Amino acid sequence: MDIRGINTPFLDWTGDALALGIFEEGTQITGELSQLDGKLTGTVQELIQEAEFEGKAGTKAVTRVGSNSPIRKVMLVGLGKAEDLQLNSVREAAGAIARLAKLEKVKTLGINLPVVNNDGAKTASAIAEGILLALHQDNRFKSDPQENALKLENVDILGCGEATEAINRAQTLSSGVILARELVNSPANTITPVTFAETAQEIAQTSGLTCEILEQEDCEKLGMGSFLGVAKASDLPPKFIHLTYKPSGTPKKKLAIVGKSLTFDCGGLNLKVAGASIEMMKMDMGGGAATLGAAKVIGQLKPDVEVHFICAATENMISGRAIHPGDILTASNGKTIEVNNTDAEGRLTLADALVFAEKLEVDAIVDLATLTGACIIALGDNISGLWSTDQTLADQLKAAAETAGEKFWQMPLEEKYFEGLKSPIADMKNTGPRAGGSITAALFLKQFIKDTPWAHLDIAGPVWAEKENGLNNVGGTGFPVRTLVNWVLSF
């Protein structure tokens, strides 16, 4: 599928289907829209009336045009109120148009959406993202991968003729999101710690990064008892992945992104019970998947920022070697942990990963993890929790997320809640009381950071979509690759 920006007015465009964005107050035919309606013998006005189209955000309508017309179909998509228009408005409108074009088996599509803040490049980029992400369908495991194959061949973004670079960048960004989606979608018999590490090596080779894989013996030498405690029950070897992107000149900043990478989590000896969706625990590496997706994009966009991408990859399984509830582990910073729940394993793997990241002497560390069900209870499926020791860093991430159209809500690091993690026989337990579970999880991770500005993203809700939602189809969403990339590019 070829996506391009052109300066052709929608009045002069020809092709299979012309898609128009309409505001709530714009359903009265005037100006150029009136001219188009006249050219199409009243088709637009007729569609508005018959579909009772009011321009509300997310609504859409389509109709055929007479056989002598230079276009075959007209599509309308609602934009909501004009004063509420944002980049994400056109991004999601473009996604709705793309899905409709697929349903209608359109081959050539013209899209006319309003330019946001007089910035044609950013608008074209958002439109391209919307198209690519809404149309992504993961058919790799179907016997006929071409079933319901896309017919769309060419998309023209009208009124954005100088946007080639922005569209190319959107395609690069979307490829990282799609990589993360497909990693999350992959079952645990295809994505293992070994194949996850191989994916990281492939990214390094194709995107200009370096890749270091620490094997179990290397991790033992570094004292990673917390990570290895989780890993020892699995028959598959753990892989500690360290990807590095360095710019050609002196970097403006040095950053670290750390992703939780449990390729499968059965809960360990605290086995997940019925109703705990054990079959969905292939997605417990969603943080690592987004980390690799961001690494792929950053390597191709080549910002003047040094970035370290870290994933401690393993499974949490059951065997005679498994950690027991009550065991004590020693992390690589010397702190001891009483394991009172083997199903709170992600934070144990992240503990050593955070210590490793801080030793790189970076300016900021961001970790992301499908860490707690408590965060889903608090914020639902579409919003990630954000905790940070540094408000400047938190504000940077929130700004990056707003540009991406991904949602975060800053949560408190309530130090008093650490009382619930105290152990009589170790420095801390790995879980606290049920109340405030996402906060105590963040406080646990904080024990493995000394002075570096740090943020924790609990992405347990938004990493997976149970139904079509915005630009997401059912399955992995690739959240929050776009936020991470925007954050890195902001320096």
UniProtKB/Swiss-Prot annotation:
MF terms in GO: manganese ion binding; metalloaminopeptidase activity
Binding locations of Mn(2+) 2: 260, 265, 284, 345
Keyword hit for Hydrolase: yes
One Gene Ontology cellular component: cytoplasm
Transmembrane segments: none
One GO-annotated biological process of the protein: proteolysis
Name of protein: Probable cytosol aminopeptidase
